Design a protein with these regions (language model features):
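Acidic, gly/ser/pro-rich intrinsically disordered tails
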Residues: 1, 14-20, 36-39, 54, ...
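A short glycine-rich, His/Asp/Glu-containing loop-to-beta-strand
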Residues: 2-4, 23-31, 42
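OB-fold and OB-like beta-barrel modules that bind single-stranded nucleic acids
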Residues: 4-11, 29, 62-73, 92
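Short aromatic-glycine-enriched beta-strand elements
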Residues: 17-30, 86-88
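Short, basic/aromatic beta-hairpin or loop at an interaction surface
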Residues: 38-46
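Beta-rich strand-turn-strand
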Residues: 49-85, 98-101
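A short hydrophobic beta-strand segment most commonly corresponding to one strand
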Residues: 87-95
Length: 118
């Protein structure tokens, strides 16, 4: 199931490269919503991979308003106290600036050339 959130980056995206050279970027998005006079904030941890990760790291910064679409997964890990805890992560399939609040200059990503198999 696809999920879309709209909010602001709470930190600059952190890019890393895993063993096979694949790019990975992690960032957090704060989503504000109002119910009557009350305002609520929800925070979402987001992960993007590959060329999307590189584009996010090169283009977006803390405070930017973004639209993120992806799927939710649950990560389980052992905390410092030795307890297994769960964390929900939005694995991004698409990320972009919210053009209602910003302008963007789009540059197509360069595609890798594939050599013929013969």
């Amino acid at each position: 199931m696809s999920t879309t959130i709209i909010g602001r980056l709470t930190t600059d995206p952190e890019i890393k490269f895993i063993n096979n050279g694949m790019a990975l970027v992690n960032f957090s998005v704060a989503v504000n919503r109002k119910k009557g006079e009350e305002e609520y904030v929800s925070y979402f941890d987001v992960t993007a991979w590959g060329t999307l990760a590189q584009g996010v790291a090169d283009s977006l910064h803390k405070g930017d308003r973004v639209i993120v679409n992806g799927f939710l997964t649950q990560d389980r890990y052992e905390n410092k106290e030795g307890k297994t805890v769960g964390k929900v992560i939005l694995n991004a399939q698409a990320v972009g600036p919210d053009l209602q609040f910003a302008t963007a200059e789009v540059h197509s990503a360069k595609k890798k050339e594939v050599e013929p198999a013969f």
